[in-house]
Amino acid sequence: MIPTRKTDEKFYRLFSTFHAFSEHLTKREDNELRDKYDHNAFCYSGQPTEDELRAALAYQKERGDTFLKLEGYEPLANAFGMECEETLTMVLPPETDIRSWKTNPDVSIKAPDADQLEQHELKYYGPLYGDDFTVRNNRNLREKLTYLGAYLGGKLVGDCYIFASDGYVCMDGLLVDEDFRHQYIAMTLMKHIAEKAQERGEILYLHADSEDTPKELYAKMGFQAVDKLYEYLCTDFSKLKI
C-alpha cells in the first residue's frame, strides 16, 4: 500500500466508521456530519456492479441522504453517469531544500482563536456550503485536528489543519484571506509545517485538485505526485444511469 493511503484512512477513522457493504464497496459513515460527502462515501476496491450501485442508492435513500459518492484509486469503467473529479496526493521528499521558499517575516504562526477561525471560514465557505454546515464542519474538525493560523497585524489571514500518523504529516484545508493574497501567507504557513516535519523526520504531503493551478505551484516547491484518488458524486439521483 502507498504509505499516504494508510495515513488518509486513519484520518477518516477519526470521524467515520467503516463497514463492508458489498463485494466491491465499503461504506464510511460520520453520524455527526451526515451531510459531508467525503465522510460518508462508498469506497470501491473494484468496479461495482449495477446491483451493487442500486443497493447503495437504496441505502442512501433509506438513511434520508440526498447524495451518493464513490471513491477509489482506479478510474471506473462504468461511472453510472456520475462526473469524476481527480485528487492528487503530493509528497515533499524529505531531502527537499526548503530554504528558498519565500515567506513573510511579519506573519506569525500560532493556534488560531476559535471565534476568529469560524468567522474566517464562514467568509469563504458560508456562501458555498451554507453557514450552518460551515460552522458544524469546522467545530467537528477542530475537535480532533491541529489547526494553525497565520496572523498579520493581529488579524487571522490564513489557516490550515494538519494530521500526523506513521511518519507522515498531511496538511489540508489551506485558506487565505483574499484581501491578503500575494503576501506569501500560504507559503509562510507551509514552510512552518515543512520545517517542523523535517525536524521530526516526518514526511509532509497534501492533496491537490488535478485540474487546479496550485498543483503546479506545489510541484515547483518540490512536491511530487505519488497517488491519485478518483471521486464520483451524484446529488440528483434521477441522473444515475442504472
What are these regions (language model features)?
Residues 1-63, 67, 130-131, 135:
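N-terminal charged segments
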Residues 1-12, 38-44, 88, 96-137, ...:
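Short amphipathic alpha-helix that is part of the acyltransferase structural core
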Residues 73-84, 187, 210-228:
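Conserved active-site alpha-helix within GNAT-family acetyltransferase domains
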Residues 129-177:
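A conserved beta-strand-loop-helix scaffold within acyl/acetyltransferase catalytic domains
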